[in-house]
Regions:
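Active-site cores enriched in adjacent His and Asp/Glu residues with nearby glycine-rich loops
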Residues: 30-50, 132, 143, 185-237
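A composition/biophysics-driven feature that prefers long, compositionally simple stretches
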Residues: 1-186
Length: 237
């Protein structure tokens, strides 16, 4: 059992270093099972899973940030946030400097020629690991058929890797389970704050704000909208 979210030298808490290592090992094992020579993910939660990198909500729509994981290699992160690339490298020492600004792409790509910089960058990384052909898994690729065509022209075969990552994430280690328990406890605390504040005349938006405030105070990166409904708004769908 882990004790809270704060690390201490006298209490066993969530071991994030162990969790990062476990997640990377799970991904590599599933890549091996599925015969993948590389996996590229644009999925924010799989970027988090493989590289422990956070894709802010405001930058997700364009799907320009991604991670490349070659067979037998390490994660390579292409990202942009409020941090500079240099600051991101300092913020995430476990990536050992393998952090770069994301090239233009994602949902903005509609033709193969627009992937030229992306392909040059990714194929260069794969070549460093001796991968110049083989099977590449694309996870949550924003323009799948365009990128598939680009990789085929470069001598690779392509598959959808969504199921590979689903299977990798489906078995949690003790640290991930501790995170799930803590998230549930935070949700309980948020609803308790709402319950304490309910009284005649209070606005629904005020109750929603109290719930979100509680979650952020307890360390949430982001929150889903609370559905606070009363009166005629409570009719079931």
């Amino acid at each position: 059992m882990s004790f809270g979210s704060i690390a201490s030298d006298r209490l066993r808490s969530i071991n994030y270093e162990r969790m990062r290592a476990y997640r990377l090992e799970r991904t590599r094992n599933l890549m091996e099972e599925d015969g993948l020579d590389a996996i590229i993910t644009w999925e924010p939660w799989d970027i988090r899973y493989i590289a422990s990198a956070y894709v802010p909500m405001a930058t997700r729509w364009g799907c320009q940030q991604f991670v490349v994981l070659p067979r037998g290699g390490e994660p390579h992160l292409f990202s942009y946030t409020a941090y500079t690339t240099e600051a991101l490298r300092e913020e995430m020492p476990w990536l050992n400097g393998r952090v770069w600004a994301a090239p233009e792409g994602g949902k903005f790509v509609t033709r193969v020629d627009q992937t030229a910089l992306f392909m040059k960058t990714v194929c260069g990384i794969l070549a460093e690991y001796g991968i110049t052909s083989g099977l590449v898994g694309l996870d949550a690729c924003p323009s799948f058929y365009v990128y598939e065509d680009a990789f085929r022209r470069a001598g690779f075969r392509v598959v959808d890797a969504v199921r590979t990552m689903f299977r990798a994430r489906s078995i949690k280690n003790e640290d991930e389970l501790a995170c799930v328990r803590y998230a549930c406890q935070a949700a309980d605390a948020a609803f308790a704050a709402i319950q304490r504040a309910i009284r005649p005349g209070i606005r629904e938006c005020d109750l929603q704000g109290l719930g979100m405030e509680a979650l952020y105070q307890l360390g949430a990166d982001e929150t889903m909208d609370f559905v606070v409904a009363s009166g005629p708004r409570t009719a079931p769908l």
